[in-house]
Amino acid sequence: MADKVIALACAAGMSTSLLVSKMQKAAAENGKDYEIFAKSTADIDNMLAGTGSPKPDVLLLGPQVAFMKGEVAKKAEIAGVPMDVIKMQDYGMMRGDKVLAAAENLMN
């Protein structure tokens, strides 16, 4: 079982798949055992409940769904899961190491 679980949510759960791969690579290079996955924003309630996937230790929203931050933040707070929106620059440039660092900062 992974030490930490990092969930990403975007419009369809597809556009973040490359970013997830880059984050997994960065984690492995640093000896971190993280489970990192992406799903659609429609799955946020299930993710926060740990239904169908492990409950995340942190939830990151893709910048294209940043408008949902207020609503998701309330749900995440109730679930005890820190969350934030991925920086547009890091998302656009697929900087897995930077997004991983942001997730780690939220978990600490």
From Swiss-Prot:
The active site is at C10. SUPFAM superfamilies: PTS system IIB component-like (SSF52794). Gene3D superfamilies: 3.40.50.2300. It comes from the Bacteria. InterPro entries: PTS_EIIB-like_sf, PTS_EIIB_2/3, PTS_EIIB_3, PTS_sugar-specific_EIIB. It catalyses: N(pros)-phospho-L-histidyl-[protein] + D-galactose(out) = D-galactose 6-phosphate(in) + L-histidyl-[protein]. Its EC number is 2.7.1.204. GO terms for biological process: phosphoenolpyruvate-dependent sugar phosphotransferase system. The PTS EIIB type-3 domain is phosphorylated by phospho-EIIA on a cysteinyl residue. Then, it transfers the phosphoryl group to the sugar substrate concomitantly with the sugar uptake processed by the PTS EIIC type-3 domain. The phosphoenolpyruvate-dependent sugar phosphotransferase system (sugar PTS), a major carbohydrate active transport system, catalyzes the phosphorylation of incoming sugar substrates concomitantly with their translocation across the cell membrane. Involved in galactose transport with PtcA and Lmg_0963. This is PTS system galactose-specific EIIB component. It comes from Lactococcus lactis subsp. cremoris (strain MG1363).
